[in-house]
Amino acid sequence: MVKLRLGHEAKPEGEVQRVRAVQEAVGPQVQIMVDATESWNEGQAVAFGRALQEAGIVWLEDSMSHQNLSGLAHLSDVLDVPIAAGEHLFGLDPFQKTFDAGAVDIAIMDLARVGGITPWMKIAALAEARGIPVAGHVIPEAHVHLLAAVPNGHLVEYMPRSVPIFDSALTLEDGHLLAPQAPGLGVELNEAACEKYRVQQP
């Protein structure tokens, strides 16, 4: 799977062209996910979502404001493609309300935003009780462990780090990210590499 950021075209046809161009570049064996970064209103999300669904996407993320729970629920009802959201939610209560509203088909959780490992696991359990898969938002070094630890873990968002701050890199094998077996998160911080990015207050 690869994820494509959308949300800047005035008409659905423009976004569809982007998706088809990427699909042609990566080949038919690679599934396309899209992230609209909350760029659309509810009406646009339905129109763009239908067009993108026809283009073969397998994931529609952040189509509209995460606060528009009724709009997200409506979108989930009218589209077959899974509606993913949640990276902008902080803590357990907003996820509870989102789940109760039927606003997501896939819950995206950010370990740093929800409050750490324990709240993350509690939210994953809430999602599991409703049959909702969960995904991690960035921080793959931690999320690979969390998603392996819950029965409804769906996928890890992974991109190679442009800044090498760890002594060892995560292993990607046949499209799967392998959880390190060393203690803790299984990665060691490279103190010398981090020193280049240290910021000191005057």
Task: Name each region found by the language model.
Residues M1:
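Catalytic domains of carbohydrate-active enzymes, especially glycoside hydrolases
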Residues L4-H137, H145:
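Catalytic core of soluble alpha/beta enzymes
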Residues H137-P202:
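Flexible C-terminal active-site loop/helix
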